[in-house]
Amino acid sequence: VYRGGRGRCGEESAFLVSALRSVGIPARQVYVPRWSHCGDNHAWVEVLCGDEWRFLGACEPEPELDRGWFVTAASRAMLVHSRIFGQGGSPLHGELLGREGGVAWFSQTPRYARTRVYTFRALANGKPAPGARFRLQILNESSFHTIAVLTANDQGEAQARLGLGSLHVLADWQGLFAEA
């Protein structure tokens, strides 16, 4: 990115996060895994100002924070998330979506879009299925794309605060599968 002077939003946002962190500015990459309204995705950067995350584009020059071409698109996103490597117990990270392989995923959606809490429940023979996995998918480019994977608690439930829209959900538990 540095030598070539160009890159996609993912490369440029990773570059900007690294540059900001190298001079002591707390920064993170924020990402929409798939837009609900078109066949694409987007990544940008948030910086910590006091105790509040503010955003800027990775490659879109704007004269102030919290402005970017993607604001309207993000207001329709089902999921805007960030990730950290580690446990991530601080409330500054946002609402925990899940952990996998040393990576913790957090929802940043409420800062960008209207949201609601979705509850997913897995039952097997009428009893809770703890540990069931829910793959949350959106229809994009004529196929379903996974935007998050949740794991059920001891009551067989998982929750996530997501944007408003339609989801396709695949659930699996001990060789049993269901979809809705």
Q: Which residues make up each language-model segment?
A:
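Hydrophobic/aromatic-rich core segments of domains that either
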Residues: 4-5, 10-97, 114
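A generic structural motif
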Residues: 48, 121-123, 137-139, 172-174
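Short Pro-Gly-centered beta-turn/loop motif in secreted/extracellular proteins
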Residues: 50, 153-175
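Surface-exposed loop/edge segments in extracytoplasmic proteins
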Residues: 54, 141-150, 177-179
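Short, solvent-exposed S/T- and G/P-enriched segments that are highly enriched in secreted/extracellular
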Residues: 95, 99-101, 106, 146-159
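Short domain-boundary/entry signatures in modular proteins, especially
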Residues: 109-117
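A short, amphipathic beta-strand motif
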Residues: 116-126
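Short, ordered, surface-exposed loop/turn motifs in non-cytosolic proteins
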Residues: 124-145, 164-166
